[in-house]
């Protein structure tokens, strides 16, 4: 697990020019009176920083260093929990219940605390992906119960989709069929949280 307890509020035209400039500035580490600074050159500039809808590797190389999902891969490629501190799977393998860490926060591009990260943010993220026809939708569209019907317009009520915020720190996801590798999909941006208030403020 990463030794951090915050999530930067990135994506959807969120990062400041200063942060982007630091990412595209040199390729070496340097020190200053303010401490250590690390600069890195990315091979390709991202078209945008929307980690929910973009399927581009350049976007996820950057936002993957700023946003946490329920799981991540360690340096050996092993799947480890990130924002999920515990989880259970029903006997039939269809329902996953995740208990979230209670110390994760959203921060804006100025470093100011914006809000707590809650289970609702994960629901909002998947709804946002469906409503905006994410390039990565194919990864989860046939997996989550009711999501394909919502995306196709057969059902217009997202509450019928199998992703629920049971409470602020409990998320439940119901699948169409058992997928032993399901948790590995939760390392991908399309399953990451997004703050509803922030999205609404951006129109």
Segment roles from a protein language model:
Residues 1-8:
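Bacterial Sec-dependent N-terminal signal peptides
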Residues 19-22:
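C-terminal motif of bacterial Sec signal peptides marking the signal peptidase cleavage site
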Residues 121, 130-197:
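Surface-exposed binding/hinge segments that line
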Residues 41-91:
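N-terminal lobe/hinge region of extracytoplasmic solute-binding protein
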Residues 34-44, 95-99, 122-125, 171-172:
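Short, well-ordered beta-strand elements
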Residues 61-65, 78, 82, 117, ...:
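Extracytoplasmic/secreted proteins, especially bacterial periplasmic and envelope-associated proteins
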Residues 86-138:
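Aromatic- and charge-enriched surface segment that lines or borders ligand/interaction sites
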Residues 24-26:
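Bacterial signal peptide processing site
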């Amino acid at each position: 697990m990463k030794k951090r307890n915050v999530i930067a509020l990135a994506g959807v035209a969120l990062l400041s020019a200063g942060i982007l400039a630091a990412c595209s500035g040199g390729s070496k580490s340097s020190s200053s009176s303010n401490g250590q600074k690390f600069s890195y050159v990315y091979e390709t500039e991202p078209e945008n920083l929307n980690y929910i809808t973009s399927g581009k590797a350049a976007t996820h190389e950057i936002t993957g260093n700023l946003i946490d999902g329920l799981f991540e891969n360690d340096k050996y490629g092993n799947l480890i929990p990130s924002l999920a501190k515990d989880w259970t799977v029903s006997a039939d393998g269809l329902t996953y219940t995740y208990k979230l860490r209670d110390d994760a926060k959203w921060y804006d591009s100025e470093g100011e605390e914006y809000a707590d990260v809650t289970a609702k943010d994960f629901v909002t993220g998947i709804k946002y992906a469906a409503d905006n026809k994410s390039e990565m939708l194919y990864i989860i569209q046939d997996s989550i119960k009711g999501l394909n019907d919502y995306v196709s317009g057969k059902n217009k009520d997202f509450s019928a989709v199998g992703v629920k915020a049971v409470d602020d720190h409990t998320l439940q996801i119901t699948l169409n069929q058992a997928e032993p590798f399901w948790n590995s999909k939760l390392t991908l941006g399309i399953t990451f949280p997004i703050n509803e208030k922030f999205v609404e403020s951006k129109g």
